[in-house]
């Protein structure tokens, strides 16, 4: 083999690999590496993997080949919005389940004779090495003359000196994957090895081979020869990865577009922008101008042009361009989509589908006292749209009535992705912390203000506030959420009951709203579907709580009520005594 080197200027590596059956008749190890094109390099990274089939099985070589090939192909088919951890873990788990099923189908119930192997994988993305490990193959970092193991062996030693794997690919229907993330810098050297190699080497010899060899492939071959001469009787595989360069900035393809393309001058009615004939302006604010346009293929679309004030705001322009990227990756009836591109663009703008209808804000003004069923129907459609975001590891982060549209057929769609968090993009190029709160204060979850961990439950909070406002016309905490600065402030928030004389509703419905907007994210619903269900019928928690005595359900209220009753009784008795 020869060195494999990436061609992208941002992340560049050299890879050397070697494998050998050793003194055995068959090689049950398998290995591979993939340096993708520049687009995939940015969003997915470089993958290096090896696997070692167990020696007691005649089909373990199939397992080794399957898991490595799955990673080198299926990993790059996962959504760009996913993190490396999510993408690789899903692929590994799927391959594990398939291999386990193959063994069961073939009647190989004993794991010692099934499609079973170890796995060591490294994915390099931006300035981080993501390590995935199952079994007793290893990943190392070479520092000078020292070898630092970055993985833990998943095996136990027997009295005879043999070992038994406690974790392996294909041994069970599910697999526990060891994961670790390590920062990388130029000059770092990593090694992936099977036990036939690392049980028969020394750090000094490894460092010497890598330093003296003309190529990393030659170094890998020399390391195998040394292990064989040292008495290895197993299959042997080693991969050497040298980091030649890492990204010097957090620039993404969005930043490159923002740097190279100009913001177009605001078009006049009837003018044409790259094949889009402008019909009229639909909306304008400090961030953008939106125009109704007719594409050259006859489709009616919306053209969104950033405001000139954004020209020096790199992060603002990145978020603007990400709106188009997000719209093209969320194929959902309840999320704003984007039409096929007409070709290269001469400037910075995005094109989305045109929604003929009204915002939820306008609908709420037109329907100040909606029926419960109307509210449920709208919220359930929003939930279906939100699921599309969360399945792609995205958070909308600015869910509010102005960012929800109802078309003329009553179909609800989530719009405006300028504040959306995309885990996979954030992993490659983090946004600056000083950007602050991106959403609208009244609808933003308190954990954003207190500096605590945000999650999909943060979007649930926003949805709960919208539901509360649709039913009452006011907000559950007024303006208090925007004043939160720390966890103590968050805990002081007090929910205002939605149920009163002006807004009659079942107590269980008020309970569902209170749970959705609870100040503590952990005490909100466990799934969006749970919130949807609780909008239609009482939750089991609510029903059970109704049957708990007041003294247990709310001791403070019980004793206050009892004390008040006793005080009233004493007053009555005293009055009677003096008559």
Where are these regions (language model features)?
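PP2C/PPM-type serine/threonine phosphatase catalytic domain
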Residues: 1-302, 306-322, 329-331, 343-349, ...
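Conserved HxN/HPN-centered segment at the entrance to the catalytic loop
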Residues: 331-339
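Conserved short submotifs of the Hanks-type protein kinase catalytic core
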Residues: 345-359
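AlphaC helix of the protein kinase catalytic domain
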Residues: 360-370
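Activation segment signature within eukaryotic-like protein kinase domains
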Residues: 378-379
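Protein kinase catalytic-loop region centered on the HRD/HxD motif
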Residues: 384-394
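C-terminal lobe helix-coil module of Hanks-type protein kinase domains
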Residues: 442-542
């Amino acid at each position: 083999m020869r060195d494999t080197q990436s061609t992208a200027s941002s992340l560049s590596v050299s890879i050397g690999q070697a494998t050998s059956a050793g003194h055995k008749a068959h090689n049950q190890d398998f290995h591979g590496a993939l340096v993708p094109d520049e687009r995939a390099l940015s969003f997915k990274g470089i993958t290096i993997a090896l696997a070692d089939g167990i020696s007691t099985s005649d089909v373990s070589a199939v397992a080794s080949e399957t898991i490595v090939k799955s990673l080198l192909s299926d990993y790059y088919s996962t959504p760009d919005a996913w993190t490396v951890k999510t993408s690789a873990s899903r692929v590994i788990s799927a391959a594990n389940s398939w291999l386990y099923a193959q063994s069961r189908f073939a009647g190989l119930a004993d794991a010692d004779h099934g499609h079973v192997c170890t796995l060591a994988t490294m994915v390099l993305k931006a300035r981080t090495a993501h390590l995935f490990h199952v079994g007793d193959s290893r990943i190392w970092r070479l520092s000078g003359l020292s070898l630092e193991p970055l993985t833990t062996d998943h095996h136990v030693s027997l009295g005879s000196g043999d070992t038994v794997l406690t974790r392996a690919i294909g041994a069970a229907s599910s697999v526990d994957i060891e994961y670790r993330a390590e920062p990388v810098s130029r000059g770092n050297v990593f090694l992936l090895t099977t036990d036939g190699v690392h049980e028969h080497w020394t750090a000094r010899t490894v460092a010497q081979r890598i330093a003296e060899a003309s190529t990393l492939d030659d170094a890998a071959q020399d390391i195998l020869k040394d292990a064989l001469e040292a008495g290895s009787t197993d299959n042997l595989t080693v991969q050497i990865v040298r980091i030649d360069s890492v990204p010097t900035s957090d620039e993404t393809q969005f930043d490159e577009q923002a740097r190279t393309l100009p913001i177009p001058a605001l078009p006049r009615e009837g003018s044409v922008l790259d094949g889009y004939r402008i019909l009229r302006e639909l909306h304008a604010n400090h961030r953008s101008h939106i125009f109704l346009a007719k594409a050259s293929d006859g489709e009616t679309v919306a053209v969104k042009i950033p405001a000139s004030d954004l020209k020096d705001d790199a992060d603002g322009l990145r978020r603007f361009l990400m709106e188009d990227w997000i719209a093209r990756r969320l194929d959902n009836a309840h999320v704003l989509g984007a039409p096929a591109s007409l070709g290269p663009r001469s400037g910075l703008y995005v094109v989305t589908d045109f929604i003929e209808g009204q915002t939820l804000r306008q609908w709420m003004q037109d329907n100040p006292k909606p029926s419960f069923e109307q509210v449920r129907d709208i919220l359930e459609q929003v939930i279906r749209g939100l699921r599309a975001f969360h399945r792609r590891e995205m958070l909308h982060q600015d869910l509010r009535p102005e960012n929800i549209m109802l078309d003329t057929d009553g179909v609800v769609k989530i719009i405006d992705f300028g504040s959306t968090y995309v885990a996979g993009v954030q992993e490659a190029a983090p946004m600056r912390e000083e950007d602050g709160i991106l959403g609208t204060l009244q609808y933003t979850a308190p954990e954003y203000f207190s500096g605590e961990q945000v999650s999909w439950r943060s979007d649930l909070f926003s949805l709960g506030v919208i539901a509360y406002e649709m039913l009452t016309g006011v907000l559950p905490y007024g303006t208090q959420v925007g004043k939160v600065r720390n966890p103590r402030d968050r805990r002081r928030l007090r929910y205002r009951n939605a149920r009163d004389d002006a807004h009659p509703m079942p107590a269980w419905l008020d309970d569902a709203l209170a749970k959705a907007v609870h100040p503590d994210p952990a005490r909100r619903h466990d799934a969006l579907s749970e919130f949807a269900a609780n909008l239609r019928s009482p939750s089991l928690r609510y029903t059970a709580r109704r049957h708990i005595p007041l003294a247990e359900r709310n001791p403070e209220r019980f004793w206050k009520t009892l004390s008040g009753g006793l005080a009233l009784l004493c007053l009555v008795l005293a009055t009677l005594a003096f008559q």
